[in-house]
Amino acid sequence: MKIRPLADRVVIKKVEAEEKTASGIVLPGAAKEQPQIAEVVEVGPGGIVEGKEIKMELTVGDKVIFQKYSGTEVKIEGQEYTILRQSDVLAVIE
Protein backbone atom coordinates (compact mmCIF):
# COMPACT_ATOMS: atom_id res chain seq x y z
CA MET A 1 0.00 0.00 0.00
CA LYS A 2 1.26 3.46 -0.89
CA ILE A 3 0.40 6.73 0.86
CA ARG A 4 -0.25 9.69 -1.47
CA PRO A 5 -0.34 12.95 0.53
CA LEU A 6 -2.55 15.77 -0.69
CA ALA A 7 -1.78 19.48 -1.13
CA ASP A 8 1.16 20.70 0.98
CA ARG A 9 1.53 17.56 3.09
CA VAL A 10 4.47 15.19 3.35
CA VAL A 11 4.78 11.67 4.76
CA ILE A 12 7.79 11.04 6.97
CA LYS A 13 9.24 8.05 8.79
CA LYS A 14 10.92 8.89 12.07
CA VAL A 15 14.50 7.85 12.75
CA GLU A 16 14.61 5.43 15.70
CA ALA A 17 15.36 6.98 19.10
CA GLU A 18 18.48 5.97 20.98
CA GLU A 19 17.94 3.08 23.37
CA LYS A 20 21.03 3.87 25.47
CA THR A 21 22.32 7.08 26.98
CA ALA A 22 25.89 8.24 26.39
CA SER A 23 26.84 6.64 29.72
CA GLY A 24 25.37 3.28 28.66
CA ILE A 25 22.08 3.31 30.60
CA VAL A 26 19.36 1.41 28.72
CA LEU A 27 16.17 3.47 28.44
CA PRO A 28 12.71 1.89 28.61
CA GLY A 29 10.36 2.75 25.73
CA ALA A 30 8.49 5.52 27.58
CA ALA A 31 11.71 7.25 28.69
CA LYS A 32 13.12 7.60 25.18
CA GLU A 33 12.77 11.11 23.80
CA GLN A 34 10.68 11.18 20.65
CA PRO A 35 12.89 11.82 17.63
CA GLN A 36 12.47 15.01 15.64
CA ILE A 37 14.53 13.69 12.73
CA ALA A 38 12.86 11.77 9.93
CA GLU A 39 13.16 10.73 6.32
CA VAL A 40 10.66 12.00 3.76
CA VAL A 41 8.94 9.04 2.08
CA GLU A 42 6.24 10.84 0.02
CA VAL A 43 5.56 14.46 -0.98
CA GLY A 44 2.24 16.04 -1.94
CA PRO A 45 1.83 18.08 -5.13
CA GLY A 46 1.61 21.49 -3.45
CA GLY A 47 -0.96 23.86 -4.93
CA ILE A 48 -3.20 26.55 -3.47
CA VAL A 49 -3.54 26.37 0.33
CA GLU A 50 -5.48 29.08 2.19
CA GLY A 51 -5.30 31.33 -0.88
CA LYS A 52 -1.52 31.05 -1.29
CA GLU A 53 0.39 29.00 -3.84
CA ILE A 54 2.59 26.44 -2.10
CA LYS A 55 5.69 25.16 -3.91
CA MET A 56 6.99 21.90 -2.48
CA GLU A 57 10.63 22.25 -1.45
CA LEU A 58 11.10 18.72 -0.08
CA THR A 59 11.88 15.58 -2.04
CA VAL A 60 11.64 11.89 -1.23
CA GLY A 61 14.74 10.79 0.67
CA ASP A 62 15.41 14.14 2.38
CA LYS A 63 16.38 13.89 6.05
CA VAL A 64 14.47 16.57 7.96
CA ILE A 65 13.99 18.09 11.40
CA PHE A 66 10.32 18.69 12.22
CA GLN A 67 8.32 20.38 14.98
CA LYS A 68 7.52 18.27 18.04
CA TYR A 69 3.91 17.15 18.32
CA SER A 70 3.07 18.10 14.73
CA GLY A 71 1.25 15.98 12.20
CA THR A 72 -0.86 12.86 12.39
CA GLU A 73 0.68 9.49 13.16
CA VAL A 74 -0.58 6.50 11.16
CA LYS A 75 0.36 2.83 11.06
CA ILE A 76 0.18 1.05 7.72
CA GLU A 77 1.24 -2.55 7.17
CA GLY A 78 3.14 -2.53 10.46
CA GLN A 79 5.12 0.64 9.67
CA GLU A 80 4.61 3.93 11.52
CA TYR A 81 4.48 7.17 9.54
CA THR A 82 3.65 10.80 10.28
CA ILE A 83 1.72 13.00 7.85
CA LEU A 84 2.36 16.70 8.30
CA ARG A 85 2.37 20.00 6.45
CA GLN A 86 5.55 21.11 4.76
CA SER A 87 5.50 24.19 7.03
CA ASP A 88 5.94 21.90 10.08
CA VAL A 89 9.37 20.90 8.73
CA LEU A 90 12.01 23.17 10.23
CA ALA A 91 15.12 22.18 8.24
CA VAL A 92 16.67 19.72 5.81
CA ILE A 93 19.79 17.90 7.03
CA GLU A 94 22.46 17.86 4.32
Swiss-Prot record:
One Pfam match: Cpn10
GO BP field: chaperone cofactor-dependent protein refolding
Keyword Transferase: no
Domain of life: Bacteria
Disulfide linkage: none
GO molecular function: ATP binding; metal ion binding; protein folding chaperone; protein-folding chaperone binding; unfolded protein binding
Keyword tags: Chaperone, Cytoplasm
Keyword set includes Transport: no
Gene3D superfamilies tied to this protein: GroES chaperonin
One cellular component (GO) term of this entry: cytoplasm
InterPro entries: Chaperonin_GroES, Chaperonin_GroES_sf, Chaprnonin_Cpn10_CS, GroES-like_sf
Subcellular location(s) per record: Cytoplasm
Positions in coiled-coil regions: none
Database matches in PANTHER family: 10 KDA HEAT SHOCK PROTEIN, CO-CHAPERONIN GROES
Function: Together with the chaperonin GroEL, plays an essential role in assisting protein folding. The GroEL-GroES system forms a nano-cage that allows encapsulation of the non-native substrate proteins and provides a physical environment optimized to promote and accelerate protein folding. GroES binds to the apical surface of the GroEL ring, thereby capping the opening of the GroEL channel.
Family: Belongs to the GroES chaperonin family.
Subunit structure: Heptamer of 7 subunits arranged in a ring. Interacts with the chaperonin GroEL.
Name listed for the protein in its UniProt record: Co-chaperonin GroES
Organism: Clostridioides difficile (strain 630) (Peptoclostridium difficile)
Lineage of producing organism: Bacteria, Bacillati, Bacillota, Clostridia, Peptostreptococcales
